[in-house]
Swiss-Prot record:
Identification of the protein by name: Ribosome-recycling factor
Species the sequence originates in: Nitrosomonas europaea (strain ATCC 19718 / CIP 103999 / KCTC 2705 / NBRC 14298)
Signal peptide: none
Protein task: Responsible for the release of ribosomes from messenger RNA at the termination of protein biosynthesis. May increase the efficiency of translation by recycling ribosomes from one round of translation to another.
Coiled coil: none
């Protein structure tokens, strides 16, 4: 029973951490990466479709993402989807490729993005603490129903606290890495 509570808490914390990683990957830093466009949906004959299902997304050079669509009729739809996204990018079509140059971030924009990632990290920490609270409440129920002893309850709560501390440290590490990436010129 205690093992189930711990396992459930750990799985939920891992899911929260994975969600944070996905959120961080959507925040644009100074250098391009192909995952930056993963969440952009293109209107493909009336159906919103992820850009990676319609084209090859590659790094053309150190400051440019290259998109080579498989259907040559959707260049304008891809450009429009990227322009309408909140990334602040200005794509252009060059022969058979949509080129997305990555302008350098201004100092003000870097600070705004840093605030955003700090907020996302804090939300992940709160989620971890809520998972801990739910696990501890479940342990209290088991104790109340006399399914576990008090010392088992205390030991399990300590283990869940260690688990929470470990995942929160992981969140802090991800935040530090992302902040350094954002502030690098």
């Amino acid at each position: 029973m205690i093992a189930d509570v711990k396992k459930s808490a750990e799985q939920k914390m891992q899911k929260s951490l994975d969600a944070l990683k996905v959120d961080f990957s959507k925040v644009r830093s100074g250098r391009p990466h192909t995952g930056l466009l993963d969440h952009i949906m293109v209107d493909y004959y009336g159906t919103p479709t992820p850009i990676k299902q319609l084209a090859n997304v590659t790094l053309a050079d150190a400051r440019t993402i290259g998109i080579i669509p498989w259907d040559k009729k959707i260049f304008s739809a891809i450009e429009k989807a990227i322009r309408d996204s909140d990334l602040g990018l200005n794509p252009m079509t060059v022969s058979d490729m949509v080129r997305v140059p990555m302008p350098p971030l201004t100092e003000e924009r870097r600070k705004d993005l840093t605030k955003i990632v700090k907020t996302e990290a804090e939300a992940a920490r709160v989620a971890m603490r809520n998972i801990r609270r739910d696990a501890n409440a479940h342990l209290k129920e088991l104790l109340k129903d006399k399914l576990i002893a008090e010392d088992e309850d205390r030991r399990a709560q300590d283990e869940i606290q260690k688990l929470t501390d470990r995942y929160i440290a992981e969140v802090d590490k991800l935040l530090q890495t992302k902040e350094a990436e954002l502030m690098a010129v």
